[in-house]
């Protein structure tokens, strides 16, 4: 059909309604559609590559939906990297479920929002307050997870009302404080007695039995029980030692004075003997010599009296020992040495010192064994549903995150 002829009419258009060689489409019969502008409703529409400016360039699409020529787009058989200088719309919608290529290139110099920074190398577990904790708080994901013990417990935190918080062990899932919420659905977890026994056999730990060690015996009670006895022995021994020290000191002093006095008396005796020999040979001329001799004799008598008093005091120390006041509670009635002359004999003193040394040589008080007290769980365990024992296989399919087939 010649589209350059001067005029068309209805009969012309109806005569050539569809030319398969020209791919011409006619709508209502009154409008002529250019084949380049027509859309085949039965086919997917692809833009004509010959209408692009660069017919040889491969056109990928960037993040803003605009086509980028070859220098921005890579080979379509390889990973596609967007234009790094592309404008980032801050209000653009980001699909939270979008696929993230784990091997994608991460620009190390990219700007990091300090309010949204997350350590890409950290393993993120979730603590009791629902916040993610990095590696130092979370354990290996292949092991049991322990929450951060120092985690902040928000008192106003939202708690799932369908968690079993009831203390009733027979409460079904969704019962809160014995107030029934939704009816338990047909898909609620059932655990048969066989499963329960298998779980118990596989995953349970034996009950902890307290085994008393030797250092757990109440040494402290025994020691404090006898402490009063040994305190009394100790004070009495110290008093006895002080008295003996004083007696030894006074006896040594008395012995020194006796030695000194005896030496002086020897000299005086020799002098008097010499004077007597001289007086026997010569006649007394005056009373002065006799007075001097009388004064010397009086002085000598006073010294002898003093010396005898000192010796008497030493003998009194030896003859009259101290009288001990015993508390009958602290005296062993089987030890007769306590009642010999009402004093401590050397044997009983030796026994007491030996007991005190034995007491001091015993092992000191050990701290008690630290047992780990189990901490309460955040959520109650799953309730158990009683089922009749049926000799059949377990229903196939996954049950939660358990390991059963």
Curated annotation (Swiss-Prot):
Stretches for region Disordered: 1-58
GO cellular component: plasma membrane
Compositionally biased residues, Polar residues: 7-25
Membrane association type: Peripheral membrane protein
Alphabetically ordered keywords of this record: Cell membrane, Membrane, Repeat
Main localisation: membrane
Domain remark from Swiss-Prot or TrEMBL: The penta/hexapeptides repeats form a proline-rich acidic domain. In addition, a part of this region contains a perfect direct repeat.
Record protein name field: Proline-rich P65 protein
Gene for this chain: p65
């Amino acid at each position: 059909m010649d589209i350059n002829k001067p005029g068309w009419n209805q009969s012309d258009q109806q005569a050539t309604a569809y030319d398969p060689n020209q791919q011409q489409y006619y709508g209502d019969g009154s409008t002529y559609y250019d084949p380049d502008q027509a859309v085949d409703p039965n086919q997917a529409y692809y833009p004509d590559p010959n209408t692009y400016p660069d017919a040889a360039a491969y056109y990928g699409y960037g993040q803003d939906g605009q086509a980028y020529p070859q220098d921005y787009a890579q080979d379509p058989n390889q990973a596609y990297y967007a234009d790094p200088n592309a404008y980032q719309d801050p209000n653009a919608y980001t699909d939270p479920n979008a696929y993230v290529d784990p091997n994608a290139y991460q620009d190390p110099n990219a700007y990091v929002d300090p309010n949204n920074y997350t350590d890409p190398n950290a393993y993120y577990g979730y603590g009791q307050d629902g916040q993610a904790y990095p590696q130092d708080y979370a354990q290996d994901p292949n092991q049991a997870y322990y929450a951060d013990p120092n985690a902040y417990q928000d008192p106003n935190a939202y708690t799932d009302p369908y968690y079993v918080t009831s203390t009733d062990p027979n409460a079904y899932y969704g019962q809160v404080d014995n107030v029934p919420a939704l009816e338990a659905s047909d898909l609620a977890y059932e655990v048969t007695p066989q499963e329960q026994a298998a779980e118990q056999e596989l995953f349970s730990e034996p009950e902890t039995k307290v085994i008393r060690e030797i250092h757990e015996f109440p040494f402290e009670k025994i020691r404090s029980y006898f402490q009063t006895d040994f305190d009394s022995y100790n004070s009495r021994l110290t008093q006895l030692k002080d008295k003996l020290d004083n007696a030894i000191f006074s006896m040594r002093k008395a012995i020194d004075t006796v030695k000194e006095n005896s030496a002086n008396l020897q000299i005086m005796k020799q002098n008097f003997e010499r004077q007597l020999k001289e007086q026997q040979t010569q006649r007394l001329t005056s009373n002065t010599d006799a007075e001097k001799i009388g004064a010397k004799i009086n002085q000598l008598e006073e010294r002898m009296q003093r010396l005898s008093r000192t010796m008497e005091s030493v003998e009194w120390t030896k003859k009259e020992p101290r009288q001990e006041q015993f508390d009958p509670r602290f005296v062993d009635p089987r030890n007769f040495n306590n009642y010999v002359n009402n004093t401590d004999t050397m044997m009983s003193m030796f026994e007491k010192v030996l007991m005190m040394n034995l007491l001091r040589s015993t092992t000191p008080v050990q701290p008690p064994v630290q047992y780990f007290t189990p901490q309460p769980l955040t959520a109650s365990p799953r309730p158990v549903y009683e089922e009749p024992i049926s000799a059949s296989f377990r229903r196939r399919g996954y049950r939660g995150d358990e390991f059963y087939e």
